[in-house]
From Swiss-Prot:
Its EC number is 3.1.26.4. Keywords: Cytoplasm, Endonuclease, Hydrolase, Magnesium, Metal-binding, Nuclease. HAMAP family: RNase_H (MF_00042). It catalyses: Endonucleolytic cleavage to 5'-phosphomonoester. This is Ribonuclease H. GO terms for biological process: DNA replication, removal of RNA primer. InterPro entries: RNase_H, RNaseH-like_sf, RNaseH_domain, RNaseH_sf, RNaseHI. It holds the Pfam family RNase_H. Its cofactor is Mg(2+). It comes from Paracoccus denitrificans (strain Pd 1222).
Length: 155
């Protein structure tokens, strides 16, 4: 049986500042890789949390049909937000338990819509801990950020 996996990561130089997101996607048949796809992008002025969210959103929006997928992130913010907090936020009109507007509500709503048509299993792993797929997602996020970083002036 084929299985889909995505490893996602966000990066930011300054917080806020230029940022990028990266996704490594794989379709597997047991131990055999059927297909691999890499995605990345970035923004000139953003935050690390927004880039982490964009990575997860981009992975799910890249799927052309309803799918079962395991999304692995090193962001506890994304994992906890999408598996625990989002239900209360939706019930409270996108407000937190203390009635404050949810930060990044635009992206949380987009992530909620993106995952609605899929069966998503969310996993968290420690970042920068030697997981090759997570390291690749990090490289992609940094590549996505690169066009938005100011050029260094040497002299």
């Amino acid at each position: 049986m084929n299985a889909l996996f995505a490893w996602t990561d966000g990066a930011c130089s300054g917080n806020p500042g230029p940022g990028g997101w990266g996704v490594l996607m794989r379709a597997m048949d047991g131990d055999r890789m059927l297909k691999e796809r890499e995605l990345s992008g970035g923004e000139a002025e953003t935050t690390n949390n927004r880039m982490e969210l964009m990575a997860a959103i981009s992975a799910l929006e890249a799927l052309t049909r309803p799918s079962e997928i395991t999304v692995t992130t090193d962001s506890a913010y994304v994992k906890n937000g999408v598996t625990q907090w989002i239900h209360g936020w939706k019930k409270n009109g996108w407000r937190t338990a203390d009635r404050k507007p949810v930060k990044n509500a635009d992206l949380w709503q987009r992530l909620d819509a993106a995952q609605a048509r899929h069966q998503v299993r969310w996993e968290w792993i420690k970042g920068h801990a030697g997981h090759p797929e997570n390291e690749r997602a990090d490289e992609l996020a940094r590549a996505g950020m690169a066009p938005f970083k100011p050029a260094r002036v040497s002299g």
